[in-house]
A protein has these predicted regions:
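Short, flexible helix-loop junctions that flank or precede catalytic/ligand sites
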Residues: 1-348
């Protein structure tokens, strides 16, 4: 099997990832589980050749010098793939994550109605958080697409690498990739504020400078979308504040409290019928009460504010999980694995 055939097999089987690892057969991740493909083990030379075929000269050089490399590429009429190539004990290896060529809408994803209202905000910061592989990019792409279909403005994305490719519909869209188009998130963000954007998407808020610039962008009248690898709204606020030195923490809390519009923390769970995965969300909206808690460093009280803010569109992860169990979408055991309070999901 050549790489194109393998990737076609991946897409056909609705797999999220293809794993190539010297000395082993290719493997795919389907609905969260890694499975072997029934083909012979691949030698180092074969895996190395496959990886090199889809790299450009700059990426090959980077891979040789750093022993790992992130990039994305497309197979025409199939899909785009986000790739991490690396070296392991048996030789060359790579993981290819499928990025569907069609951007799903908020309706396609069965997102809560409040997501469209969040995307409609004219300014502020909206964070989508969760572990790797929890569908953050897919949710954000749907929110950007909503903006693109309903408003006339300039959307600027800064990604590493570019995942979903957006067409300019009602909006002008410019997508920049760290590496080929800009040297860093912080460089691109600094320039972004002079590029007349209405919306800025920051693929990953990974360091102090990027976080500071994203907050400044939100403060100066732009809508900023960003992602973090945190599992709840409270942990997200703590994670942002913790990046800054003690002397700045109070100022950063004030900045977040002014600009935060929503934090959506999501996780994927296997459906009860075993045919796929479904997202569960904690949703925090930047209400006056929430902003106050952030400003006063009472983040621990945020959970109960979210719990009691249902009429405002808020929900805790456990509330969402309970609904999904009641609707027979997921099993109690699956919900218990992700729940904050496991006792709510006794039995199986």
């Amino acid at each position: 099997m050549d790489l194109t055939e393998l990737l076609a097999f991946v897409v056909k089987n609705k797999a999220s990832d293809l794993h190539l690892s010297s000395g082993l057969p290719p493997m795919i991740r389907v609905h969260g589980d890694v499975r072997r493909i029934n083909v012979p083990a691949m030698e180092h030379k074969e895996v190395h050749g496959m990886i090199y075929d889809i790299m450009n000269d700059g990426q090959r050089k980077f891979y040789e010098e750093n022993l790992e490399c992130d990039f994305s590429f497309a197979v025409p009429n199939l899909a785009r793939f986000r790739v991490n190539a690396f070296v392991q004990q048996r030789g060359a290896a790579a993981v290819m994550r499928t990025i569907p060529s069609k951007i799903l809408s908020l309706e396609d994803l069965k997102c809560p109605k409040i997501f469209a209202e969040i995307a409609d905000q004219p300014r502020g910061i909206v964070l989508v958080t969760g572990p790797t592989g929890s569908g953050k990019s897919t949710t954000l792409a749907a929110m950007v697409n909503h903006k693109n279909e309903t408003e006339q403005g300039h959307i600027l994305t800064i990604e590493d690498p570019i995942e979903f490719v957006h067409e300019s519909k009602k909006c002008l869209i410019n997508q920049r990739e760290v590496g080929p188009h800009t040297l860093s998130f912080s460089n691109a963000l600094r320039s972004a504020l002079r590029e007349d954007p209405d919306v800025i998407l920051v693929g990953e808020m990974r360091d102090l400078e990027t976080i500071r610039l994203a907050l400044s962008g939100a403060e100066t009248g732009h809508l900023v979308f960003g992602t973090l690898h945190t599992s709840s709204a409270a942990k997200t606020i703590d994670r942002i504040v913790d990046v800054f030195p003690a002397a700045e923490k109070e100022m950063i809390r004030a900045m977040i409290s002014e600009s935060i519009r929503a934090i959506i923390s999501q996780t994927l769970l296997k459906t009860k019928d075993g045919t796929g995965r479904v997202a569960a969300h904690e949703i925090m909206i930047g209400t006056p009460a929430i902003r106050n808690l952030i400003r006063e460093n009472k983040v621990a009280q945020m959970y109960s504010a979210i719990q009691t803010g249902r009429q405002l569109g808020m929900q805790t992860l456990d509330q969402n999980l309970q609904e999904m169990v009641a609707r027979n979408l997921i099993s109690s055991a699956e919900a218990r694995g992700k729940a904050m309070n496991k006792d709510n999901f006794a039995g199986g």
